[in-house]
Amino acid sequence: MGAIPTTSSAATLVPRLRRTLTLRDLILYGVIVLQPVAPMSAFGALSDRGRGHVVTAILIAMLAMLSTAISYGRMAQVYPSAGSAFTYVAQEIHPSAGYITGWSMVMDYIVNPLICTIWCAGQAHEFAPGLPVWGWKVFFAVVFTLLNLQGIKTSARVNAGMAAAMSAVVVLVFVCAIRYILGHPHNDFGFFTRPFYDPQTFTLGNLFGCTSLAVLTYIGFDAISTLSEEAENPKRNIMLATVGTCLVIGLLSAAEVYVAQLVWPASRPFPNQDTAYVYAAALTWAPLFKIVGLTLLIANFGSGMGAQIGAARLLYGMGRSNALPRSFFGKVDPKNHVPRNNVIFIGVIVLIGSFFLTFGRGIELLNFGALIAFMGVNAAAFVHYFVRSPQKKLTNFIPPVLGFFICLALWWSLSVPAKILGSIWMALGIAFGYWKTHGFREPLSFEVPAE
């Protein structure tokens, strides 16, 4: 075969991604990634932490995420092929700040499959109590690992079908909840406002503590920024789609938890906090116990599998760049083309961690890292579009500053144990990075390599 000529005409033969994704397509993709049932799994933990007030917490979290989404969308215009908080912060602020952001992302990637395993084990135990919860934890940790070792993954069509099925379940829950509420009339108008504000249990500490957990509902919206090369008018549509996704998920999530709190008030304890939404739904129509429970189990199963392989690929990228020992983390199984060592490594961490962490504490650790990354992106957008820009526009000042300080307040509202555990993780990572880069003088990569 002859050599490829290096002429300008040959360049036209290089395949490029077609820009076919409209604004609506991008928002739909974002909703699929975040899942229409996003707040249901965490409803019990949110209600317990906020003593109710879950609706208000989700709406406040939405305000923080909308500001952060604007920053993500704007940074995607500057770095259209990156889509990573690590890249934004490292390039705009300092490589050491980028490392801190990247290390917080590593914790997120590891904790995500862990909390999915914990939740799946709890729900499976509700369906089959003959096997203890610890047995289900072992089962799901092993199954996630074995399936990922085989390179099994769902197709885009299956994911879209699952999103449609979840949406149908959400509609069914709304119908049953409305029927139940109308069948149990309340003359007290406070009944309908209590999910927003209950004077008997409201404190700012409870509200912001709940809001710091509610951030989980929105984690993943930044995935839209990875579609810049396939989107029509990406400079406009990526930011609009990111903001639109947060808005759609926020309003939908608020509606979902609102009807749940009307049906099952915060003053009434749940039989199982982790599967609280399933019990609230079943109160409106008994078959929903199985319908909602199975839907959430499948959703968390898929999320757990995807999160584990995502974590394994991140560690592979770090191993390939020698940020981690290449001999272990930088290898790929030649048969199934997966980072085998990393999949097993994450599987072991998930299995052990599931016996020491609760679902609620896992959410806090996940948000500990996510909020650091969000603050980093807001800071990067502020530096690029305001500090370094000759034109000091308020539109380039308000969103990143607002997003940064709301995220900071939410991060500070995490529980003390979560902040201690997260800080230990960050301290170990910073010490490792300082040693590995000889005082942050050499680059380290936290980019997830393409499949």
Name each model-derived stretch.
Residues M1-H53, M65-I70, S81-A82, F191-F192, ...:
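Membrane-interface "cap" regions at the ends of multi-pass membrane proteins
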Residues A3-T7, T87-A90, S96, C116-K137, ...:
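Helix-loop-helix connectors at the membrane interface of multi-pass transporters/channels
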Residues P39-W136, G205, T245-A255, G422, ...:
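Extracellular loop-to-transmembrane helix junctions
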Residues R51-V55, P129-P132, G161-G293, A418:
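Helix-loop-helix junctions that connect adjacent transmembrane segments
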Residues S81, S104-I118, L213, Y218, ...:
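Membrane-helix boundary/coupling elements in multi-pass transport proteins
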Residues T87-Y88, H94, E126, A241-M305, ...:
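TM-loop-TM module centered on a large, flexible mid-protein loop between adjacent transmembrane helices
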Residues V133-F191, T242-L247, L366-G376, T395, ...:
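Membrane-interface loop-to-helix entry segments
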Residues V158, S327-R340, F374-L421, G439-A450:
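C-terminal membrane-solvent junction of multi-pass transporters and transport-like membrane proteins
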